[in-house]
């Protein structure tokens, strides 16, 4: 219904308010700065522990749908910013991004001085749950997969 679509649009604007539109500066010697991480397009996880993460799942697909539904290109443009930004820390041979093995994706990317765990700004926290990060990126990089699954 149109009402549901309008509510989805409002919710998307709220969710987008948690995404970075600028790049946090990192000091020389901080791992994230040394590998050239750009925070634009990353979502802030919470106001309490203030780190960025790849918690995206179907959000980019929803933004692309909203872009078409409302003829609003900013939604799809920011979905592309999110998508390209999330690719930065994909570890592969020669570009491990501070991760020990290819195929793992870092979680709890610390971009502020607020440190609720270990390592501090410019590093990953020692808390690491690779399962959900892989699931989130799988959804982001295979658009339409969930819809196709539920249509079966």
Segments and roles (model prediction):
Residues 1-4:
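Short, small-residue-biased leader/transition segments that mark boundaries at the very start
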Residues 6-30, 73-97, 152:
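Long, well-ordered core segments of solenoidal/helical folds
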Residues 14-17, 21, 65-68, 85-88, ...:
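Positions within ordered alpha-helical repeat solenoids
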Residues 26-54, 95-136:
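Carbohydrate-binding/catalytic loop surfaces
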Residues 51, 146-150:
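Hydrophobic alpha-helical membrane-insertion segments, chiefly the h-region
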Residues 63-66, 72, 76:
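Charged interaction patches that mediate protein-protein contacts
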